[in-house]
Each structure stands twice: as C-alpha cells, then as structure tokens.
Amino acid sequence: MSCADTHNIDTIYLGGGTPSQLTTGQLRQIFDAIYIYNNVSPDAEVTIEVNPDDVSVEFAAMIQQLPVNRVSMGAQTFDDARLRWLRRRHTAQQVSEAIGRLRAAGIGNISVDLMYGFPDETLDHWERDINAALDLNVEHLSAYCLSIEEGTPLHRMNMKGADEETERQMYYTLIDRLEAAGFEHYEISNFARPLFRSRHNSSYWDGTPYIGIGAAAHSFDGHTRSWNVSDIRSYIKAIESGTQCAESETIEGDTAYNDLLTTALRTREGLDLSRLTPSHRDYCLKVAQRFIDDGLLSVTPRLVLTREGLFVSDMIIAELMKA
C-alpha cells in the first residue's frame, strides 16, 4: 500500500504480533517495501515491538542494519513468579540484558510496558516494579491494569485481580513516582521523558490518518475507517489474488463525536471543544457538568480529566458518548 501521492510517513510501527521473531531478511523486505513505495520523513519515528527473550546479541546487531530508532518491549513485571503466572517466556534478568544490548546497538529510545493489579499484589510489590523500570533509564513507559476478560483461561480459572481501591492506589503511586522522576504523564496510561512521547500513538489520539497493513489491521484516512479481514489465511489469499480484504465505514455524526471523545479525552491536553459541532458541544457540556461539579473534569477551555478523574476515565467517557 502506498501513500506517496498524499502524505509523508512520519511514523512506522511494526507490532501487533511478534516482529522480533522475523529474520533480518524478512524485516529488511518489509522496510524496503515501505521506503521504496512511500515518502518517509527523514526524521520518522520507526518502532519495533520485541519480546525481551528475543533480543539476543545477534538480534541487536540486526537492528543496526534497519531504520529502527525506537523499541517497545513488553516487560510486564520484574517478578519472575508473576511472569510465569502470565506464561511469559522471559525473566526479569532478560529484560535488563535486552535493554543493555539495544543500547549497545545505538537505540536511544526504548519504551517498556508494565502491568499492575495482579492477584495478591501489594502496593510494595508494585513500587518495586516501578523502581526496577526506573533503574533501567528507559525513555518511555506504559502501564496497564490487569484485566481478566470473560472466556480467557484466567477467567475460567476463577482468578481475580486486585480490588478497586488497591488498583487506585497503584495507579496514583505510578503517576507520583514517574512524575517525580521527570516523566511527563501525557496520556492515561503513558509516560515519557521530555521529547520522548510516542509520536505514533499520539497520532491516533490526534486523529491523524494512518495505514494498517496485515490481518485485522485498521486504517483511517481522515473520513473513513477500514479494517482488514482477521483470518490470516483469508488475508493472504486476498492479497495474492488482488481482491478486496477490508470492510469500511464513514466516520461522521455521532460516530465522529464518539471517536474524538474517546481519543482526545485520554490525553493531557484533553478535548478541544471547538472541534465539535454545536449540537455535540452542547450535549457534551451538559452531560459533563456533573463530573465538573464533582471535580473529575475541568474546562480550561478544553475539556480535561482532572487528577481525580483519571482513574475513572472509562466511566466518564462512556457517560459522555452518544449511543
């Protein structure tokens, strides 16, 4: 797919699977196709997702041969027992070793994903994980509360995460510790050192057009959202035969309002009310008033989640959406 006639590509994100399992040749083929058929900005942010145990000395050397300048690593936790419970292959030691190898390969922008809210996890346990992440001197950190979804193995095992009050304390401890360490809390779950926000993720929250390549990948051109077929065999067959492999919908009316709300309100800058139609702006402010009165939202003049509103953001956004 090419966007050479329309826009420069400002960010590339290779993920949504396990790209660190690919060979040097396979990765080079992907990047060659992107760079040959598209206008890629000279300062593009180019991210690859990796598993810590995949970052061997050889993999780090391979990174040096590619245009990658940012790595996102799923550490999840630095507690080996919890990693085994999550059925992750790596250990806490492998996370540290992987980051060391990436630094030696010249990667100066590393993001780590963490998870909190495990069964029986205490605030002390969580603080140890935060401290371990800070000791690695990464530029970016994302943290998500463990969610045990219906139908998953953990749900079938009748496992439960931490209680809501413990999750709340963990979340605000995370914010306080990272901000004290110089990180900017720029989105509900994302923290960055100065100048190291994820440009790719920020483009989603800003409503910037993007192209998704691969099975189940989504794309957005500013007006229409499309999504590829999720079955990998059907996707490959469609690509090989040159047939349509995606469905689409036009983003307008209430759908456009809901999309803007659910992305912009997650950010530190909040929702620019001037981007709403007059009727949607009136509706939004009317519903938001009780949250403003409760100190969960503020108008600055953008609509912004307060510190107290961050933890209950999902509930607030759901209430503000139009059915």
Could you describe each region identified by the protein language model?
Residues 308-323:
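Short, amphipathic alpha-helical interaction segments positioned at domain boundaries
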Residues 50, 305-306:
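Hydrophobic residues in beta-strands and at strand termini
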Residues 33, 177, 290, 294, ...:
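Solvent-exposed, charged/polar functional surfaces in cytosolic regulatory/catalytic domains
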